Design a protein with these regions (language model features):
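Bacterial signal peptide processing site
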Residues: 24-26
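A short beta-strand signature within small-molecule sensing/ligand-binding domains used
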Residues: 140-149
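Extracellular/periplasmic ligand-binding regions of membrane signal-transduction receptors
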Residues: 28-59, 191-200, 205-220
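Sensor-regulatory modules in signal-transduction proteins
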Residues: 136, 150-152
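Extracytoplasmic/periplasmic sensor domains and loops in membrane signaling proteins
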Residues: 94-136
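Short N-terminal helix-loop-first-beta-strand/juxtamembrane motif that initiates sensory/input modules
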Residues: 65-86, 181-220
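Helix-start (N-cap) segments at beta->loop->alpha junctions
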Residues: 163-178
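C-terminal motif of bacterial Sec signal peptides marking the signal peptidase cleavage site
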Residues: 19-22
Length: 220
């Protein structure tokens, strides 16, 4: 009798083992997006076409919330170039960019366009870049903006991180570096004049922060 039931018993064991293996493979295949690099999850977000209804959006936003809090920025956000009127992975960086993931307390709508500025394209082309001047966030608060590229696991720039950083104390002494001030020097693309040391330090600081956190979001 033992010989009679030997092979069915072995077969049963094999079936159990194969079933467990199959379940394991399925788990690995489906995976959890939170285990992936933020940049690769961003690719999936854009490709989904679901905007902020995408199932992983809230988790992705939480990581930008962390960037905002840790850096001391007043605002942290993601911009993408546009194609066919919506944010894209391969849009034209010489035209307007659109906001996507937004860490603001009162976020802009998905896809709201930001009028093109040279620092957007510079960041998209792979170099951290800053605005050429500060601006008024409010009457009491001035900010300087910086942008840096975010790379996916295939080494593609898939978006740019933007941060707005408070600089009121510095700009109070150099109002000509505030584009919203009557004494603004007018620099929008190339800076041809001398940059005061304090202003240069501010520029370097915000650029370094944008680059640091963009690298944390990247898959590189």
């Amino acid at each position: 009798m033992r010989r009679r039931f030997k092979y069915p018993a072995v077969l049963a064991v094999l079936i159990i083992v194969l079933s467990i293996s199959a379940c394991g493979d399925k788990s690995e295949e489906t995976g959890n997006d939170s285990d992936k690099a933020w940049a690769d999850r961003y690719v999936a977000l854009i490709q989904s076409g679901e905007a902020r209804d995408y199932e992983d959006y809230d988790n992705m936003k939480k990581e930008l919330d962390r960037v905002k809090e840790e850096s001391g920025a007043t605002y942290a956000y993601i911009l993408s170039p546009m194609a066919d009127g919506k944010p894209a992975l391969d849009g034209d960086p010489s035209k307007d960019f659109a906001i996507t993931v937004d860490a603001g307390a009162e976020p802009d709508d998905w896809g709201v366009t930001y009028e093109w500025e040279i620092q957007f394209k510079e960041a998209w082309d792979g170099d951290p870049a800053t605005a050429r001047s500060a601006w008024d966030d409010s009457e009491e608060l001035q900010c300087w903006s910086a942008f840096a590229p975010v790379y996916d696991s295939e080494d593609n720039v898939v978006c740019i991180l933007g941060i707005d950083y408070p600089c009121t104390d510095v700009i109070a002494d150099y109002p000509e570096w505030n584009r919203d001030h009557p004494e603004w020097n007018g620099y929008e693309t190339e800076i041809t004049g001398e940059i005061p040391a304090a202003v240069q330090t501010q520029i370097n600081e915000v650029k370094t922060l944008a680059d640091k956190y963009a690298k944390e979001l990247s898959a590189k």
